[in-house]
Swiss-Prot record:
Interacts with GRWD1 and members of the heat shock protein 90 and 70 families; these proteins may possibly be methylation substrates for the enzyme. This is Histidine protein methyltransferase 1 homolog. The modification Tele-methylhistidine is found at residue 144. Gene3D superfamilies: Vaccinia Virus protein VP39. It comes from the Eukaryota. Its EC number is 2.1.1.85.
Length: 362
């Protein structure tokens, strides 16, 4: 699968990447099958769409069902805020002035892509060494799961719906320039990073887990900051690259938050000069029907009247019961948003790309 964008990563990033002698980042096909009941790993990823880097984990095969994906590409929140016994408080994660320190002790690798785009991401398997013992990192990798309900809602792995949406950005020539964008349940932050590279005036990243923001999203954002001097995707010579202060200035248009959706809403809406989002991007966040009410309320409160939501999802998620059709029915019953299917990917597990807009925008 090729992604074609009209921008490229900074040339100096090559100096920050750790050499991977084993050719870790390659596209591998999946072989064999595993019993669904023996693993909570996402099964049945289509062979031509799973970018299987060691940082992204592996998956077992299946035909029609799926288990919960990464929710910090998917942040889960229960149905009614007031009924939730312990809401995860929201907070903003400040980007350090010295962005180089964000990448210290991080192992970065390039995601496979076309010659027109390169994206570096943290090799998340390396985080096991930084966080030894019992914690959400070790538990996620040891259990082969990207979901520990109420504790860890994903983000250490990137699932194929994110790539589906990135591909759609190119095919549909989605315009980001001048837009205020929210990457909701961001995980790796690839959707928001793409928007930033596309000229968005401001990009916010939200994830359930603060650790995912600090150790995955933030480093990915810093590693992919576009140079203002770039022209037609060609990087300037080393001597003309932006100084650290200029890189920090470029990241100022990005803000990062952690916490549950309801708490995140409270935090940003408490700002006197808060302006709602023109575009909300979200991938694999509708796997659990228990979260639909809070997700719907979040979109209702944060989307501008003429804005739109671009959502990517599996048709159905095995084990939790959520999926596209159930979510569409929920939205229709609320009567606030119109939904439109943009694309159906019928390779392996069926996947959908959807658009949501207000029924009465003005």
């Amino acid at each position: 699968m090729a992604f074609q964008f009209n921008f490229s990563i900074e040339e100096d990033l090559e100096n920050k990447l750790t050499s991977l002698d084993d050719g870790t980042c390659v596209l591998k096909s999946q072989k064999g099958k595993e019993d669904k009941n023996q693993s909570t790993e996402l099964p049945g990823l289509p062979q031509d769409r799973l970018w299987k880097c060691s940082s992204l984990g592996s998956a077992a095969s299946s035909e029609d069902t799926d288990s919960p994906p990464s929710t910090a590409d998917r942040s889960g929140v229960p149905e009614a805020c007031e009924k939730q016994p312990s809401l995860k408080p929201a907070k903003e994660h400040v980007i350090p002035k010295d962005c180089d320190q964000v990448l210290e002790n991080k192992v970065l690798e390039m995601l496979p892509g076309s010659q027109h785009v390169s994206t570096a991401v943290v090799k998340t398997i390396s985080l096991k060494e930084k966080f030894p013992g019992e914690n959400i990192v070790s538990q996620s990798f040891s259990s082969h799961s990207d979901l520990i309900p109420g504790v860890y809602e994903g983000g250490l792995k990137i699932w194929e719906c994110t790539f589906d949406l990135m591909t759609y950005f190119t095919k549909a020539k989605v315009k980001f320039a001048g837009q205020k964008v929210l990457d909701l349940g961001c995980g790796s932050g690839l959707l928001g990073i793409t928007a930033s590279k596309g000229g968005a005036r401001e990009v916010h990243f939200q994830d359930y887990n603060g650790l995912v923001i600090d150790e995955v999203t933030l480093p990915n954002v810093v590693a992919n900051v576009p140079l203002q001097g770039d022209s037609n995707g060609i990087n300037e010579p080393a001597g003309k690259r932006q100084r650290k202060s200029e890189v920090a200035q470029e990241t100022c248009k990005c803000r990062l938050f952690s916490g549950e959706w309801a708490e995140f809403c409270k935090l940003v809406l408490s700002e006197k000069l808060f302006v709602k989002y023109d575009l909300i991007l979200t991938s694999e966040t509708i796997y659990n029907p228990d979260y639909y009410s809070t997700l719907h309320e979040t979109l209702l409160r944060l989307l501008s009247r003429n804005g739109r939501v671009l959502l990517a999802s599996k048709a159905h998620y095995f084990g939790v019961g959520g999926g596209v059709h159930l979510f569409q029915k929920f939205v229709e019953e609320k009567g606030v948003f119109e939904t439109r299917t943009l694309e159906v990917i019928d390779e392996g597990l069926k996947r959908f790309l959807m658009e949501m807009t207000f029924k009465c925008p003005s």
